[in-house]
Curated annotation (Swiss-Prot):
The keyword Nucleotide-binding applies. Belongs to the ABC transporter superfamily. Keywords: ATP-binding, Cell membrane, Membrane, Nucleotide-binding, Translocase, Transport. The lineage of its organism: Archaea, Methanobacteriati, Methanobacteriota, Stenosarchaea group, Methanomicrobia. It comes from Methanosarcina acetivorans (strain ATCC 35395 / DSM 2834 / JCM 12185 / C2A). This is Putative ABC transporter ATP-binding protein MA_3551. It is found in: Cell membrane. Residues 4-239 form the ABC transporter domain. GO terms for molecular function: ATP binding; ATP hydrolysis activity; ATPase-coupled transmembrane transporter activity.
Length: 453
């Protein structure tokens, strides 16, 4: 279903600067969209048009199939449904307190006092700023200001959220927190549109990419389709995403198999060819054709399971005592990724899960989960890039626990299950404090009647 569409959009600023030339786009409902291009390519102007802040000189914009109208009442409805967060949060935040700033939009829409209060409280809780509601916004950090701006848009309950360079001037942890928020909004049905010149972000995050250069749309498609086109990227003044660049290099060297477009480090690792032959040192007296017990391999040497018991057949013995052997692998203990829904948080329960489950790696996603963990002295090994890092630890046979809440529980669960399904590498995945819970894979192997998550 197309939620937002433009036809032949053109815009020139009063000083003669041509910002947009003939832009035609179709945004599907519920998708994550990235507009990618260098500064000055027209992304910000397009966003101001999509929100009704600017009016096109030619062409039209349609929302749910109906053209934009520019009278006051129609514009109020457009801006309620299509919220925008500016690149510089200071351009958007002006009220004396955080609460008043977030309440500005709902108040302008004519909400009752009770509805305004409920909307603001919900938005602040969602972005983790409830305790700062009475603070002056100019005392906040860059990441906190960005979350205030997002809360102000969210309080109006828009169907589409547009963010112009959402990660500009944020440190890596702050950037991860903002992307966690956007993923959660999208999980609950919001269409998310961002602009960025960060090709790595656009490649790994978006469902669909529009490539812009010099006020024109020069390419569009899935991230895999757009970012494989070297000439198109060169024309836009951009480079290939790092993950894709590394994959193409290992593919060129014959170290990868299949035609893949890995977006994450775990997906990239999974493209590597399994080792079939290896040089090893052999004891004196071993002959060609004999079998050897190599022992257990893990990490980069285990290609099919996190830990593998290796037997080998000696194919050729070199005069220096080393031999080429053919490896025969058998997977042994796998790790896993458990999720704990912090909406049903109990400190004794979490501590018991960590103890009984022999958890060695704990991460938290979302401000609420991180705050609760820190307050109660739960040691966190990771607070950014939590899903990918937990998957990598599980591949090394480690048992991991992710503390999160709301829509991020299912988001993390689906991301991890998707990796297991695509890779064929099996490890435990599940939400530990939901009905039925989950069991470690090795426990299931010992009891085939047990439920497997």
């Amino acid at each position: 279903m197309i939620i937002l569409e433009t036809r032949g959009l053109k815009y020139t600023y009063p000083d003669g600067t041509v910002a947009l030339q003939g832009i035609n786009i179709e945004i599907k409902k519920g998708k994550k969209i990235a507009f990618v291009g260098q500064n000055g390519s027209g992304k910000s102007t397009l966003f101001l048009l999509l929100n009704g802040t600017l009016k096109p000189q030619e062409g039209e914009i349609l929302f749910h199939g109906s053209p934009f109208k520019y009278d006051s009442k129609s514009l109020r409805e457009i801006r309620k449904s299509v919220g925008i967060v500016f690149q510089n949060s200071d351009d958007q935040i002006f009220a004396p307190t955080v609460y008043q700033d977030v309440a500005f939009g709902p108040a302008n829409l004519g909400y009752s006092k009770e509805r305004i209060d409920a909307s603001v409280q919900h938005a602040l809780e969602h972005v983790g700023l409830t305790r700062l509601k009475d603070k002056p916004p100019h005392h906040l950090s860059g990441g906190q200001k960005k979350r205030v701006a997002i809360a102000g848009v969210m309080a109006m309950e828009p169907e589409v959220i547009i963010l112009d360079e959402p990660l500009s001037n944020l440190d890596p942890v702050g950037a991860d927190e903002i992307m966690d928020l956007l993923n959660e909004f999208n999980h609950f049905g919001s269409t998310i549109i961002i602009s960025t010149h960060d090709v790595d972000l656009a490649y790994r995050w978006s469902d669909y990419v529009y490539l812009m250069s010099n006020s024109k749309l020069i390419g569009q498609g899935t991230p895999a389709e757009v970012f494989k086109e070297q000439e198109l990227l060169k024309k836009a003044g951009l480079r290939q995403p790092t993950t894709l660049e590394i994959y193409h290099e290992i593919e060129r060297r014959g170290l990868a198999y299949g035609k893949n477009s890995p977006k994450t480090i775990p997906e990239l690792v999974n493209t590597l060819k399994p080792l079939d032959l290896m040089w090893v040192e052999v004891p004196p007296g071993v002959r060609e054709g004999e079998n050897l017990n190599i022992g257990v391999m893990y990490g980069e040497y285990a290609t099919q399971s996190p830990y593998e018991a290796i037997n080998a057949t000696v194919l050729h013995i070199h005069p220096d005592g080393r031999a080429i052997v053919e490896l025969k692998r058998k997977g042994i203990k796998a790790g896993g990724v458990l999720l704990y829904d912090m909406d049903s948080y109990s400190l004794p329960e979490v501590r018991q899960i960590i103890k009984d489950g022999e958890i060695v790696f704990v991460g938290a996603m979302g401000k609420q989960s991180k705050t609760l963990a820190e307050q109660d002295g739960i040691h966190l090994d990771v607070t950014s890039g939590v899903i990918d890092k937990s998957i990598l630890m599980a591949l090394c046979g480690k048992r991991c626990l992710i503390l999160t809440s709301g829509g991020m529980v299912d988001h993390a669960l689906n991301r991890t299950r998707e990796y297991v399904e695509k890779s064929g590498i099996e490890f435990t995945v599940g939400v530990v404090n939901r009905e039925g819970g989950c069991k470690w894979i090795e426990e299931i192997d010992e009891n085939p009647g047990a439920l497997k998550i």
